[in-house]
Amino acid sequence: WADDEVKPLGLPRAIAKEFAQVVSSEMTIAADGGPRADFINEQLTRFQSNVQNSIELCMALGGMAFKPYVSGGNVFIDSTSAASFIPLRFDDGDNCVSGVFKSQPVKVDKSYFVKLEYHDFTDGVYTIRNKAFTSDENGITGSEVELGRVPEWAAIPEEVQIKNVEKPLFGYFTPPVSNNIDTASSLGVSIYGGATEDLI
């Protein structure tokens, strides 16, 4: 519908960006209690300096999962938007305790591969299952195959269980608006959900 005479205002992006600026500028995360706390604060400072883009995506798409990982002796936090994270289960407090992280497609020869990483927290046991899928067409999950079909996934275990865990090892964040599209769902919606046609 857009042409030389009719141009979109771009309000959805502007709204998401404005909310992200407010959230990230007022965000404070701190730990105290010695050398370990100092290390945590150092890692969190790096995360906070880059978090605005992630929050902007969260506001636009309706959700974001944050998952920490270790690399080179430092802790990094992977931000996964609603396009690549599927919440599967919520506890009585509406906290996401199970979900699936979908990797970016990897092309090997003429085939595309994606890795689905299932995370589940049940009764103090945290389970991670890794599965690989392949398709000849990009964007299609396809059929399940062995993880080893992709060289960089070959060393990843198919399943890991961690016991005596108090909470999920990821966080699921949604915009502070009610889901007016599916009122029975715990999933988040865009900050401008329900008004998309009026805003474009």
Each PLM stretch: what is its role?
Residues E56-G63, K67-I200:
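Structured, contiguous alpha/beta core segments that scaffold functional sites
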